[in-house]
């Protein structure tokens, strides 16, 4: 009895010492780090956060501690940046210091710092430079890719016509269309819309992405070192990510067997050729793992961002039929019904441009941004961020900054129109992030959004199962990404 009592006292004393050491360490750092709520050992600020509304939880904390504060997600120390001025100051004015990539635990299970999106330093720079050049070689930013988008838009319109006005969920209609554009670049060909393997890939992408937006996905961000070994929905996300990697690996192996170094067919071929050229370079970043995971980065990002934005956009246009009618009027006046829209038409279509920008602003697809990491001890305002500190640039707080948008919670294309009805840019329009690590697919995404939306709206009216006033446009999930509500709609020929 005495022995067990002594053991209990010893255990309590040991835990007390650990707690005191943790608090002391955190307080020691707080003289350099921005202020924030006091964390508990091991769990950090978990008890102060609503994992179902992580973005809103962090913004609520910023009301107390200001636009720069420190939060602990479990043992992860994060500096959170809110508002246009703060985010720009970090990502643009101190771009190099904030250019490291922070953690995204779900995707890090697979990527582990390889590929283009989740890497840092020289690897990220080399892969980014190569990817930008290679995408340009295959027509991105040129007439060639515009023709590819227009061709795919034609296939999409045909598939909508075949629904004969029935109510459908547009999710996979959109994702397979958008995915075929990036597929033609990275794989050299498009998929048939009914290809079962293709549809399986799209489900894997959507499933793994949706997990990151769930409450459990946010809990996993805090306790991944333990949860990756436990049963739960994270295991399904891992299975989906593994399935995507396996598919890309199979594609790469096929290209290896049929490669002509003098005639690259696609992004994979170009990377394989670069691997051959750098075979004797001991410091090369061009090897199989980076090829597979960079290709997956491009395939994933090139599919989900634009298709999810369009899906949210359709819902918003059904909610606000007067806005839909104005877009129809501008399309009829500038383009007419007898030719396909061209990307250059946007210069004469300020209202449509404003609507597309407002859809992106309202959708706010990556509200907390991709996490950054400071590359060295960094002085930021009155604080000192130790090398390796993770940073959340809250892109949603920029897209909803009341200094730039009069009614940031409302969907209103006037946010991007001047007094004369002409399109106006905004320094707070950052859906593709800003600075050195902005999304280099921005140009392609802008072209896709304009051409797909105008092609579809040139041919169809949108009809909801609900009256406009009853449509709820609140997101279904908000975590690492924003997931719009699930709905069905009808495409009625004009």
From Swiss-Prot:
Cofactor: heme
Any single biological process term in GO: response to stilbenoid
UniProt main location, coarse: endoplasmic reticulum
Sites where the protein binds heme: 439
Catalytic activity, as annotated: an organic molecule + reduced [NADPH--hemoprotein reductase] + O2 = an alcohol + oxidized [NADPH--hemoprotein reductase] + H2O + H(+)
Keywords carried by this UniProt record: Acetylation, Endoplasmic reticulum, Heme, Iron, Membrane, Metal-binding, Microsome, Monooxygenase, Oxidoreductase, Phosphoprotein
Residues that bear N6-acetyllysine: 379
One Gene Ontology molecular-function label: iron ion binding
Membrane topology listed for this record: Peripheral membrane protein
Phosphoserine PTM positions: 131
EC nos: 1.14.14.1
CDD domains: CYP2A
This protein's GO CC annotations: endoplasmic reticulum membrane
Tissues in which the UniProt entry reports expression: Kidney and lung. Expressed in liver, with a strong circadian rhythmicity. Circadian expression is regulated by DBP.
Subcellular location: Endoplasmic reticulum membrane; Microsome membrane
Function description: Highly active in the 15-alpha-hydroxylation of testosterone. Also active in the 15-alpha-hydroxylation of progesterone and androstenedione. Little or no activity on corticosterone, pregnenolone, dehydroepiandrosterone, estradiol or estriol.
Additional record remark: There are only 11 differences between the sequence of testosterone 15-alpha-hydroxylase and that of coumarin 7-hydroxylase. By site-directed mutagenesis it has been shown that modification of position 209 is sufficient to convert the specificity of the two forms of the enzyme.
Protein family according to the UniProt entry: Belongs to the cytochrome P450 family.
Protein name: Cytochrome P450 2A4
Species per Swiss-Prot/TrEMBL record: Mus musculus
The encoding gene: Cyp2a4
